[in-house]
Amino acid sequence: MGQKVHPVGIRLGIVKEHNSLWYAGPKSYSDCLVTDLQVREYLFKRLKSASVSRIKIERPSENVRITIATARPGIVIGKKGEDVERLRRDVAAKMGVPVHINIEEVRKPDLDARLVGDNVAGQLERRVMFRRAMKRAVQNAMKSGAEGIRIQLSGRLGGAEIARTEWYREGRVPLHTLRADIDYASVRAETTYGTIGVKVWIFRGEVLGGMEQVQEEQKQSKGAKKRGRG
């Protein structure tokens, strides 16, 4: 049987960045790793309505910097920044060190695998027909500029007695091409019939310049945001 490697994991350091950026010695490494997992789980659960795509954790010296990528930054920040300040205090209490929280806006949520997966899972929980939910998500992604997308659902689809797997694809999704910018996410939909697994692969084009190009594009987008605020 052919087995698939994680599309993001195999591209780390080539066209993808790590979600945790820090160094720790052998004694403290496991504690830092467990803390990262707990904080991510806590933030995804607390900010469920804010369409959070990615949580990046950095540990410079004796503090922690957390970057939250969200399609709805207003919900995270709150009125006059009250919500984000409360969130910062709660996370700092959990981690036991000073915490800085940065908010990053996801400009095209239809090209983000996590957000597309959450959207499809939400529709399944509201009893929307699974084929309609898949097709709508695929069409929106292609309209937003995706070169290819694949969505796969597994479970008791439509309330069927026997679980099965259905998938829908449009365009191309080259999993073997390492320079291909492929975003991947796996989400669960908790329906009345049981859990349905939702997997999303989105091909957003090829990155020919490697990590240098990725970092340059990130700098440009941050610069544009600062100019916009000014």
Swiss-Prot record:
Key words of the record: Ribonucleoprotein, Ribosomal protein, RNA-binding, rRNA-binding
Pfam families: KH_2, Ribosomal_S3_C
rRNA-binding as UniProt keyword: yes
Any GO BP annotation: translation
Gene3D superfamilies per UniProt: 3.30.300.20, Ribosomal protein S3, C-terminal domain
Keyword Ribosomal protein in annotation: yes
Cellular component per GO, a single term: cytosolic small ribosomal subunit
GO MF annotation terms: mRNA binding; rRNA binding; structural constituent of ribosome
Domain KH type-2 stretches: 39-107
SMART domains, alphabetized: KH (SM00322)
InterPro entries: KH_dom, KH_dom-like_a/b, KH_dom_type_2, KH_sf_prok-type, Ribosomal_S3_C_sf, Ribosomal_uS3_bac-typ, Ribosomal_uS3_C, Ribosomal_uS3_CS
Cross-referenced PROSITE patterns: KH_TYPE_2, RIBOSOMAL_S3
SUPFAM superfamilies named in the record: Prokaryotic type KH domain (KH-domain type II), Ribosomal protein S3 C-terminal domain
Chain segments annotated as coiled-coil in the UniProt record: none
Protein purpose: Binds the lower part of the 30S subunit head. Binds mRNA in the 70S ribosome, positioning it for translation.
Annotated HAMAP family: Ribosomal_uS3_B
Family of this protein: Belongs to the universal ribosomal protein uS3 family.
Record note on quaternary structure: Part of the 30S ribosomal subunit. Forms a tight complex with proteins S10 and S14.
Name this polypeptide is given: Small ribosomal subunit protein uS3
Lineage summary: Bacteria, Pseudomonadati, Pseudomonadota, Gammaproteobacteria, Oceanospirillales
